[in-house]
Amino acid sequence: MDMYERIKKSIDFIEINLTEHISLNEVASKAFCSLSYFHNVFRLMTGIALKEYIRNRRLVSSAYELVNTDRKIIDLAYKYQYETPSPLPELLLKCLE
């Protein structure tokens, strides 16, 4: 399996688990890499840091649900693993601009 396929496999894992706690070590293990090596390769191949990628995907998913469902921000905040709902409205406004 080449590195592209490993990164793809780790991204698939992230997508499946967006609403769960995601361990960065577990993501790296999906690519059969150490965390430090995976961080470097992920950023090089995607142009974004791993944590930022996860944060952005959760934000986009929560924004989509906010617009297309009747779910409340507080429910979405907890669903997408925000510790408190307070930062989500501001982040969503930035995302929707």
Annotate each predicted stretch with a short phrase.
Residues S34-L35, E83-T84:
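Short coil turns linking two alpha-helices in DNA-binding domains
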Residues Y4, K8-N25, L44-Y80:
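Terminal helix-turn-helix DNA-binding modules in bacterial transcription factors
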Residues A31, Y80-Q81:
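Core residues of bacterial helix-turn-helix
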